[in-house]
Amino acid sequence: MGPAWLWLLGTGILASVHCQPLLAHGDKSLQGPQPPRHQLSEPAPAYHRITPTITNFALRLYKELAADAPGNIFFSPVSISTTLALLSLGAQANTSALILEGLGFNLTETPEADIHQGFRSLLHTLALPSPKLELKVGNSLFLDKRLKPRQHYLDSIKELYGAFAFSANFTDSVTTGRQINDYLRRQTYGQVVDCLPEFSQDTFMVLANYIFFKAKWKHPFSRYQTQKQESFFVDERTSLQVPMMHQKEMHRFLYDQDLACTVLQIEYRGNALALLVLPDPGKMKQVEAALQPQTLRKWGQLLLPSLLDLHLPRFSISGTYNLEDILPQIGLTNILNLEADFSGVTGQLNKTISKVSHKAMVDMSEKGTEAGAASGLLSQPPSLNTMSDPHAHFNRPFLLLLWEVTTQSLLFLGKVVNPVAG
């Protein structure tokens, strides 16, 4: 009999809802993947040891996905990195180090124990209840009923990652796959459907992470200002008619002359914000190549509030990825071969990773909205020297980064090429 297979599964759903704003207690600002300053007497939360690395991992992964996929991109760096870190708990020393170093951690500067405590702190902070936004992150382990897991592993994943363990009958792969999909669908309130594809009867474990985010704009768009049909230019030869939201509101934004792109920060109620990056026509690859932590820090320092004439499409996109083909290209090579040692899970050797699947969705639409029709042209970069209000017209492909502000964690990262692709 061949080796048994292990699946890593990550899912994410982001939904933005428009509603009346509450009184603000001050503007939120993107600081980039750097923790905010603390008083000298106050120790920094443990998650500050890991969030910059997660951001760097996200940017590396994005570039590989962009090189492979010309269309929409959307994934959750927090979901994928959490799943891999959780897996490392069941790996022996060499394999565990390979996983964490592949994520980008320097184990000399940040020992493994500190990394896991960082994830524990991050997940705990993200799970804190908030009346202003809904954020749910969870981890689950589905282990073949014929195997007995090591109690130390079960205790560790529960204590550090809040992971629940379930017994599963992988000899009946169809039924078990349906049960796991149903579980993930319930945890994401019906938004993530059929995330787990078919798998082999030799599967012995599925490690799943899910993240659900739902928030309301600090400054809502009026549905009466939404144009039912406006042109969105996928490329030089292709245009689509899409619903285009419109508002004149105070937002932080800038025009980066070096990279030829507009950068816009839109705040949600609660501790979250969206960063939208709109390259000038023909400049997407230039901007993507420059995606580095220092670029995000620069933007965070230069964003200034201004009354902005904003046009933003309603969109709903998703991303489904088999990351076993992508992860080796960014340093996670050896965890996918027969030499990887995950005997810390059950005490048995010859258990290898077969699949690393990830699915994420984003919905920035207004339910049931009906509005008039209009069309637009390719926009030019906003100019601060004109008498009219600066404007940002998102009628061509743009980047989307969604941040949780307290932890400075990059929850979602993507590119909108076709707003109506689903």
Swiss-Prot record:
Q: What is its main location?
A: secreted
Q: Where in the cell is it found?
A: Secreted
Record has Ubl conjugation as a keyword: no
| Alphabetized InterPro entries for the sequence | Serpin_dom, Serpin_fam, Serpin_sf, Serpin_sf_1, Serpin_sf_2
Q: What is this protein called?
A: Serpin A11
- Please list which residues make up the signal peptide: 1-19
Pfam families found in the cross-reference section = Serpin
Similarity comment: Belongs to the serpin family.
List all annotated glycosylation positions: N94, N106, N169, N350
**Molecular function terms from GO:** serine-type endopeptidase inhibitor activity
Top-level taxon of origin = Eukaryota
Keywords in UniProt for this one?
Answer: Glycoprotein, Protease inhibitor, Secreted, Serine protease inhibitor, Signal
Q: Pull one GO CC term from this UniProt entry.
A: extracellular space
